[in-house]
């Protein structure tokens, strides 16, 4: 009896919550200190540990679930179960090499008894209709990862177990190392730099000449180019002058601004800058090399382009001057010519009824400078001599540019236009120049390029035999001769009128 009492002294009587298949007592076994539900949630169980039987914990009572305490597994069986779980969870051997030791309490238990396993499955699979008040974890594997310290990793084990590889260069982004360039002679580099600077200067001149050509062909035909379109011009009526006498100063400033927009000064300055750049290019050192030849060829074509722009601008200006001179000649008569047509004598003037030649002179502006008095009194003569001066300066600049480009004196445009002033000499000299051109051949590269241009523009042909667009040089020559012819005819009459002005 004592033996029997000793055997059952430490036996544990099952509580009603645990249940028993036999209804009697069980041999001594080791149970967990926490119920299955608290053990799965890894929280402290609040079951009553003072009594012999395990009372249901407060959480299970609040949830209305059955509180079950499972048996502990033997240590040897626990180790085997842990090893089997690790192998089945991750077959990668690298995982075991780099994994930290796992505590035995964190591993899932393998309960062999059907009663315990059934009870655990019933507990882990609650009804879907119940609303859990805490976060549930579906699987034991997710719980075990907390013991590994990997719960904060988004990528699972790979975030800690995968080795960090260095960034290798992509074969598609690999850069080929450039071989060092051979050393360049300082003289060659200096010459190339000088040619590039000349090209920049030529490009700037070319752009300015292109803008001037646009202004001459589009804007100039809309306005007077040698007089200001002001109410104080000799073509304005006396009533118009009287109406605007109050705002004379404002109109004068406006007219002066409009007059300053005429690009004749810009054109001559651009031609002078082109001449300066061409002289610098002629004085530049010449080195035998492919790069130097290419740069010089580029500068040569740019310089020829600037020269052709000069020719076209001067031709357009000459045509515009001639058309407006003829318009002024046909529509207006100068005050001196009006006084000369009356031909009054000093005696007749004194005996007349208060009328004299002064009555034909228009009212003068209060701000009229002395230098503009001639254009105010005789606009036609002023326009003729202004046109002659413009053509003279323009052709002279063309001649200087041709000489700097290496064009022979008999092969340029300036040679086809005589500056002597006699039309007969112009025609004879032009014929002699054309025959000289036919005999001589251009020698320099610039001369050969210009020879092709002049041949295409009809410089060596008559105006009738020139092509549809090859009338530039012929038009310049024709306007030059007509303007100078009108100036010669008008010059003698102007001097005679000045001598016959009554005191």
From Swiss-Prot:
Alphabetical list of PROSITE patterns matching this protein: ZN2_CY6_FUNGAL_1 (PS00463), ZN2_CY6_FUNGAL_2 (PS50048)
GO molecular function: DNA binding; DNA-binding transcription factor activity, RNA polymerase II-specific; zinc ion binding
Cellular-component GO terms for this entry: nucleus
Localization, UniProt: Nucleus
Disordered: region residues: 89-124, 331-358
Claim: Zinc is one of the keywords in the record: yes
Superkingdom in the source lineage: Eukaryota
InterPro entries: Carb_Metab_Trans_Reg (IPR050797), Zn2-C6_fun-type_DNA-bd_sf (IPR036864), Zn2Cys6_DnaBD (IPR001138)
Biological processes annotated in GO: nitrogen catabolite activation of transcription from RNA polymerase II promoter
Keywords, sorted A to Z: DNA-binding, Metal-binding, Nucleus, Transcription, Transcription regulation, Zinc
Record's description of how this protein is used: Lovastatin acts as a hypolipidemic agent that works as inhibitor of (3S)-hydroxymethylglutaryl-coenzyme A (HMG-CoA) reductase (HMGR) which reduces HMG-CoA to mevalonate and is the key step in cholesterol biosynthesis. Lovastatin, simvastatin and related compounds are widely used to treat hypercholesteremia and reduce the risk of cardiovascular disease. Furthermore, statins such as lovastatin were found to be anticancer agents.
Known role: Transcription factor that regulates the expression of the he gene cluster that mediates the biosynthesis of lovastatin (also known as mevinolin, mevacor or monacolin K), a hypolipidemic inhibitor of (3S)-hydroxymethylglutaryl-coenzyme A (HMG-CoA) reductase (HMGR).
Name the record gives this protein: Transcriptional regulator LovE
